[in-house]
């Protein structure tokens, strides 16, 4: 430790690495929870303006205290256990749903050298951790011992597994181009090439050569997070609120925290993998975290715009899109990218 942290490190002695890691975790999780809270307000405001409404504007100036009021309300509400539910698993379900969306942030780089765990197999770690989110939904649906939660859980399991396959193939294309599983190296690999030398850095990012994979990954991310128009998991007209029917209070809030945390995670990963992360779009502007934040906010706006614009898809249409369209397209594009990399026409040489 250098500078002002050295006296603190000496104070804690051998336990300092553990304390330092815990401090870094808090430094990531605390702002994330704040972003999740105000993303709910942003969603209501954005959709309100799209529908020529005002949105929340009563609690605090311009409604800025609305997320705090909602959080206090859910915190004070009683958690009701259905008489036929398995109480232990009933509580474990929301925790299992939220935990992977928080753990995945360990390998996400926010700037050059600014990452909690600089893991060489970061991409593989992300695939492994994010695939566990479905277990929380399944456990919640089964533990509720009710038909609507169980149907919603089965829908969620099928949908999330289906779109994980196409997301995985899209990530293989990123791996082929960058030749690395380390997320920081993937970002840095997008900061070189012919377009970068010309000062047009945004044309050297992965979104251009992998445009079909960029679109597939983004749409699959919306489906993976069970957001509209892929929200048949909690289709109000059919199964009320899906796997969350029997939940109330903070147990119910944990599912919403998981959903919005996953939205932010998918958005920042899209920015890191396809949009150059913290890299500046043009050569004369400096790189920095502000570019990553701006790109992530833009992807989040697409999530909100999709919810306000598109009607809910039918369940069989969602499955058909995943298995009969996205998976064949991604398989073909993996082969195309592999052949392209070995050809003299490759733009990465």
From Swiss-Prot:
Protein topology in the membrane: Multi-pass membrane protein
GO cellular component labels: plasma membrane
Coiled coil: none
Domain of life, per lineage: Bacteria
GO biological process terms on file: aerobic respiration
Transmembrane segments: 16-36, 88-108, 123-143, 157-177, 202-222, 264-284, 285-305, 325-345
UniProt keyword terms in alphabetical order: Cell inner membrane, Cell membrane, Membrane, NAD, Quinone, Translocase, Transmembrane, Transmembrane helix, Ubiquinone
Listed HAMAP family: NDH1_NuoH
Name under which the protein is recorded: NADH-quinone oxidoreductase subunit H
